[in-house]
Amino acid sequence: MQKANKRIDKEYKELTENPPEGFIIKAENIFDTWDVYMKGPEETPYVGGTFLIKMKFPDNYPFKPPKATFSTKMYHPSIKKDSGEICKDIYEEGWVPTKTIKGVLEILKSMLVAPNTDTPLETEIANEYLKEKSKFDATVKEYVTKYAQ
């Protein structure tokens, strides 16, 4: 087994046996793509939703980060509405091989708790979050009801 595969295998076993709170991880081929199901964090407008994140591993993982995208349609400043692409600033920039998937999952969850509006992929959503928080929250709740049940 290649070094990268050993690392992925080890992380997958750890995360499926003892997942972080609010996460379920599944995969048909653990060396390619994982299906990560994340519960919406408490005390956020995302609560009550379950969000599917596709985690795709490059051949040279852990030297390059996995590519995470939301398959569930999201309303968030750092997530592209049309593609589910996540802002690279969130976890890809500054990636080092000692970072783990568990760490990435914690970052993705914290992103829903406290959105970063400094470098948004969706500028209008970031502005709404900053200027009309109640409208932002209401739209998120609509998305949760419509797409994340």
Predicted regions and their residues:
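UBC/E2-like fold recognition across ubiquitin and ubiquitin-like conjugation systems
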Residues: 1-149
